[in-house]
């Protein structure tokens, strides 16, 4: 399945280690997904009927709905940490509003759970990482 890749504005990107589908490691450019690509990847792997976009507390968020609970997926791309770090180091950059949003959800919408999801993509290989909220 092909997902939309974000076009890089900065042509000074540094190559870093990438994981191929067969688990081989190559050195190449990151291939972060667009916000819509993230949404489509989540829908593809979690089920079209289970994943939707909703406005909750004035924020447009992705919601995973299983039969037990609604989980807000605050998802961002995993990319290279940048120079001067080793080429295997990756990161996820979480916007400041994520923490405020989580605190507001706990107070105002306790029926929801919130997850920080990192999405790594390279040549069709997708890896999802569920981060621990308490570390944010």
Regions inferred by a protein language model and the residue ranges of each:
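Intrinsically disordered, charged low-complexity linkers and terminal tails
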Residues: 1-136
């Amino acid at each position: 399945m092909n997902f939309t890749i974000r076009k890089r504005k900065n042509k000074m990107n540094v190559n870093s280690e990438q994981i191929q589908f067969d688990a081989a490691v190559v050195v190449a450019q990151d291939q972060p997904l667009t916000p819509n690509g993230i949404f489509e990847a989540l829908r593809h792997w979690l089920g079209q009927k289970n994943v939707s976009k909703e406005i909750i507390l004035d924020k447009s968020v992705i919601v995973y709905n299983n039969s037990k609970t609604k989980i807000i997926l605050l998802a961002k791309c995993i990319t290279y940490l940048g120079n001067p770090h080793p080429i295997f180091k990756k990161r996820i950059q979480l916007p400041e509003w994520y923490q405020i949003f989580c605190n507001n959800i706990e107070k105002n919408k306790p029926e929801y759970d919130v997850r920080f999801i990192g999405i790594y993509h390279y040549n069709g290989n997708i890896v999802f990482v569920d981060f621990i909220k308490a570390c944010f």
